[in-house]
């Protein structure tokens, strides 16, 4: 899940990615939801804590924000095509990274504007659960 400006408009991105056929490439399945969608429900949305959730089972994976499904991807579609052809990364052991990435020097955008600081990146807690082997997660 990312917060990103597209054409100057702030969006929440709910992305899945895996290896593409060309070396170093990725295949993306992403959904962009304008921040205004969340602000229309709650004008104070930016000041509040939110619950991000990712569920996956043997059939698909799903990204939720505050209980709202933002993106869903069938597991069968996320099979690597390059060096690791035929391997589905979501059937391998996983780890979790929590990261606040700012700026994008790779796209020539230059350094982060100091006037945009300070920014807040607060995490209250992280929980990891394992659903029963049957895949029941409802």
Feature locations, PLM:
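GH16 jelly-roll
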Residues: 1-138
């Amino acid at each position: 899940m990312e917060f990103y400006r597209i054409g100057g408009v702030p969006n929440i991105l709910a992305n899945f990615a895996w290896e593409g056929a060309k070396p170093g490439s990725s295949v993306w399945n992403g959904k962009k939801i304008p921040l205004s969608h969340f602000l229309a429900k709650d004008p104070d949305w930016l000041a509040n804590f939110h619950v991000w959730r990712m569920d996956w089972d043997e059939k698909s994976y799903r990204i939720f924000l505050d209980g709202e499904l933002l993106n869903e991807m069938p597991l069968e579609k996320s099979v690597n095509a390059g060096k690791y052809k035929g391997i589905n990364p979501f059937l391998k052991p996983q780890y979790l990274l929590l990261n606040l990435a700012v700026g994008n020097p790779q796209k020539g955008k230059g350094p982060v504007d100091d006037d945009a600081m300070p920014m807040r990146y607060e995490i209250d807690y992280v929980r990891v659960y394992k659903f029963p082997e049957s895949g029941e997660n409802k």
